[in-house]
Regions:
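ATP-dependent small-molecule kinase phosphotransfer cores
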Residues: 36-82, 86-93
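A glycine- and Lys/Arg-enriched "phosphate-lid" helix/loop adjacent to the NTP-binding pocket
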Residues: 95-135
Length: 166
């Protein structure tokens, strides 16, 4: 399998799904969201799955969904916690270009609704989770895009430009 996929990683509310859909529209590639795949397989949203079965079970389900991905020419938006699973990340790196949507904490905090349940380890705060994940996103990404206050359409154009430059 070639690396024809574009895989989006980043914190919750960093724009993975929004930018991914824009990239899908611009490139004609299919769009997949691993959280939506999990929901269709389990009948539960990631939030409800974590509440019912716990974070470890969710991360295992997420890993299985990702390891089962055998797609080409697709844009794949992943759950924010995917970087906790080395095997899943190595699989993603093997099937595509991994793009990290790096977004400042203050921007993320303003986007995340207060009642949104995030896949946090050991009851950590959103900020602690953010700090913990940054080195993992950087470790696994092929390309990092500094999102700042950029419009999603500009981020998508920047990603396409970087990929086309090769």
């Amino acid at each position: 399998m070639n690396k024809s996929n574009i895989i989006m990683i980043g914190m919750p509310s960093s724009g993975k799904t929004t930018v991914g859909k824009l990239l899908s529209h611009k490139t004609g590639k299919s769009f997949l969201d691993t959280d939506h795949i999990i929901q269709s397989k389990t009948g539960l949203s990631p939030k409800d799955y974590v509440s019912a079965h716990g974070l470890d079970s969710f991360l295992e389900t997420q890993q299985n969904v990702i390891l089962d991905l055998a797609v080409e020419n697709s844009i794949i938006a992943t759950g924010g916690g995917v970087i906790y699973n080395a095997e899943a990340m190595e699989h993603l790196k093997g099937i595509g270009i991994v793009i990290y949507l790096k977004t400042d904490f203050e921007i993320l905090e303003s986007r995340v609704s207060k009642d949104r349940k995030l896949a946090r380890k050991d009851g950590k705060s959103f900020y602690d989770t953010y700090l913990e994940r940054i080195p993992l996103y950087e470790k696994y990404s092929d390309i990092t895009v500094e999102c700042g206050e950029k419009l999603s359409s500009h981020i998508a154009e920047e990603i396409l430009s970087i990929i086309q430059q090769g």
